[in-house]
Regions:
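Single conserved hydrophobic/aromatic residue that forms the stacking wall/gate
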Residues: 1-9
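Radical SAM enzyme [4Fe-4S]-AdoMet core and its adjacent flexible, acidic
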Residues: 2, 19-80, 140
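A glycine-rich phosphate-binding loop feature that marks nucleotide/adenosyl-phosphate handling sites
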Residues: 10-13, 47-52, 87-102
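A conserved mid-domain beta-alpha-beta active-site/ligand-binding segment of alpha/beta enzyme cores
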Residues: 13-19
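C-terminal accessory region of radical SAM enzymes
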Residues: 67-97, 124-127
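C-terminal extensions
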Residues: 95-125, 151-212
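Residue-level signature of tetratricopeptide-repeat
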Residues: 143-144
Length: 212
């Protein structure tokens, strides 16, 4: 735990992959640090055996960069999107989906909440729609006071429609005729290569061989 200038810059770093904890356990620790210790930020670092010390664990697939990325995405959901760890993971399902970001994965497992009507949903509901960020949600709420919004408006606002289109309607209509089916939407989302950042795709570690 680091402190600076009072306790304004409290932060914690966790090394990922050196010990056998699941993502669920790691995120529960982070959630506790935020809620009970008022931490400003938790950092996650993929374990790298820099000195090749034989006493340290060897990770055949290389540093778990994709796992680190998913933890950061989930951390963002905790801090800015009102998610709780127990909504994202459980003891029976303790690790994040490597193929999908945590928000998309949550939405797929809770299709009963979708589609969301853009012109009526409140701010907190909009936050849970894949492809809609905090700024976009605020802009939607503000813009629809003047006029009903359509999909072209959402694109201008900054909504990532290639993800959001499966989960929203504008004035009762979806962007395209779309089946609200978990397998169908999952396959479509996985086909979106932005689910895995380019720098990780290009890293060349064995952990990414599933995506080649």
């Amino acid at each position: 735990l680091s402190r600076g200038l009072g306790d304004v810059y409290k932060r914690q770093q966790m090394i990922i992959g050196a010990t056998p904890e699941h993502d669920y356990e790691i995120m529960r620790v982070a959630e506790t640090l935020y809620q009970k210790f008022d931490l400003k930020r938790v950092f996650y670092s993929a374990f790298v055996n820099v000195n090749h010390d034989s006493n340290l664990p060897v990770l055949p697939g290389g540093p778990p960069l994709l796992r680190e990325h998913r933890l950061y995405q989930a951390d963002w959901l905790l801090r800015y999107y009102d998610f709780k760890v127990d909504e994202l993971l459980t003891k029976d399902r303790p690790d994040f989906n490597i193929y999908l970001d945590p928000k998309c994965d949550w939405a797929l497992r809770h299709l009963e909440y979708f589609p969301v009507e853009i012109n009526r949903a409140d701010y907190h509901t909009l936050l849970r729609v894949p492809g809609i960020g905090a700024k976009s949600a605020s802009r939607i709420v503000k813009a629809r006071r003047m006029n009903k919004l359509d999909f072209s408006d959402l694109k201008k606002i900054g909504v990532v429609l290639k993800r959001a289109l499966y989960f929203i309607t504008c004035s009762g209509r979806m962007m395209y005729p779309t089946k609200l089916d978990e397998d169908y939407i999952c396959r479509s989302l996985i086909a979106d290569r932005t689910q895995i950042p380019r720098e990780i795709r290009e890293a060349g570690y064995q952990q990414l061989s599933l995506f080649s």
